[in-house]
Amino acid sequence: FSRQPDRHLLGAETPTESPHVVIVESTYGVQLHDSREVREERFTSAVHAIVRRGGRCLIPVFALGRSQELLLILDAYWRTHPELHGVPIYYASSVAKKCMRIYSTYINMMNDKVRDAHAHGNNPWNFSFVQNLPSPDMLDDSQPLVVMASPGMLQSGLSKELFEKWCPNKLNGLVMPGYSVYGTLAWSLIHTEPKTVKSGSGEYLPVNLSIHYISFSAHSDYAQTSEFLDACEPRHVVHVHG
């Protein structure tokens, strides 16, 4: 859970009564997240820098959750930067496309900003600069572009295919917005900065593209979890997922 509101969802609510036991995540322990504003500025700056130098920007994501927030951020950023209007943004996930229908259907569950925009005839999920990529075969990567593809840890699928294709070129860039598990390619790229990686075909590829890690984790940090527990005043606390 997260106590911090984002572009479309409300923060987690606090129970109105004090439970005897609260089972709560401890994913980040005593770590603190950057503010939403700082994260968004770092994210958009990294993406902008990559496409401005003529590169292709890969954003590996999970199909549901933070993907939708990142699309909203990019669409809003593109809207205020006319020089980027010719640079396409794609999300390449059939699951994400199905999720969009659910998000559009349940606008009433979103935050005040989204509901207000919808009430005035502006559905935030009708993007101006973001489009779905029906098939990888339809991707023209001869020019700068942004692709948001799953899976988020680069272990297989389109995100790994694009990474292997783009990683030798120093103009290109990888922006990692999510959590990565030890042993995955994503974790290795963030924590060990390898000079080469082994492709699915067994070939060793040079890693020349820029790598940026900007956490948009949906898990609460120490401050959020502590605030939640202080408000609940439980007799007992059980920590999980950490």
What are these regions (language model features)?
Residues 1-69, 73-88:
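His/Asp/Glu-rich metal-coordinating catalytic cores
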Residues 76-79, 124-242:
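C-terminal regulatory/interaction regions
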Residues 65-66, 84-105:
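Short, conserved secondary-structure transition motifs
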Residues 108-130:
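Ligand-binding beta-strand-loop-alpha-helix segment within the catalytic cores
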Residues 58-61, 89-92, 175-176, 239:
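A structural signal for short, well-ordered beta-strand segments and their strand-loop junctions
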Residues 1, 26-28, 62-64, 94-95, ...:
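Active-site metal-binding loops of divalent metal-dependent hydrolases
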Residues 38-40, 73-78, 104-113, 189-193:
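Short secondary-structure boundary/capping segments
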Residues 4-6, 30-32, 65-69, 97-100, ...:
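Flexible loop/turn segments at secondary-structure boundaries
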